[in-house]
Amino acid sequence: MYLNGEIGSLEEVNVYAASTFYSIDRYISYQTDWSRDCKEGRLILADRYTTSNACHQMVKLPQKEWDGYLDWLADLEYTRMGLPEPGLVIYLDMDPNTSRRLLEKRYGGDESRKDLHEANLFYLLSCRGAALYAAEHWGWKVIRCCDGSDPYPPEQIHQAVLVEVDAWLRRQHPAESDGF
């Protein structure tokens, strides 16, 4: 409902309300789908976890409020809701103009297929700035995915991700690091 604009525009939906929609969705997913695996120590790979919510919502606030929002979101999800805090976050940094061209290709030029966020280039540019800010605030690894106009080949991005994951796994399991 939110991404389709059914409850209001980006500007009309309160940042904390929108964040809570996603937080509750993550909580339900955790409780019903993957909490057992997490508690048993299995490696969980997530796309668009709390970190994505942070980037998309904090841009709606004045920048002077970003640190407070990030602290609030971490407290809500990791402390109050008990969701697991990520051990490693890799932000794939793609220039929004390049991303927009890729989306146009994916959707065959049909603008109606874009969600509320994808349809707004200024918003996407703002989200990238917010993501880079959050990466610094929370200590994420940032991997550039384009040269400013063209995306890097998927194999190159994949290799950069593997380097970061391998380094993280070696730090987490030093006795087993020869097996990675």
What does each model-identified segment do?
Residues 39-40, 84-85, 136:
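Short loop/turn elements that form and flank the Walker-type P-loop nucleotide-binding site
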Residues 45, 88-90, 141-143:
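Hydrophobic/aromatic beta-strand patches that form the interior of the parallel beta-sheet core
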Residues 1-75, 80-81:
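ATP-dependent small-molecule kinase phosphotransfer cores
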Residues 51-129:
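A glycine- and Lys/Arg-enriched "phosphate-lid" helix/loop adjacent to the NTP-binding pocket
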Residues 36, 44, 87, 171-176:
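Short, polar/charged, Gly/Pro-enriched helix-capping and turn/loop motifs at alpha-helix termini
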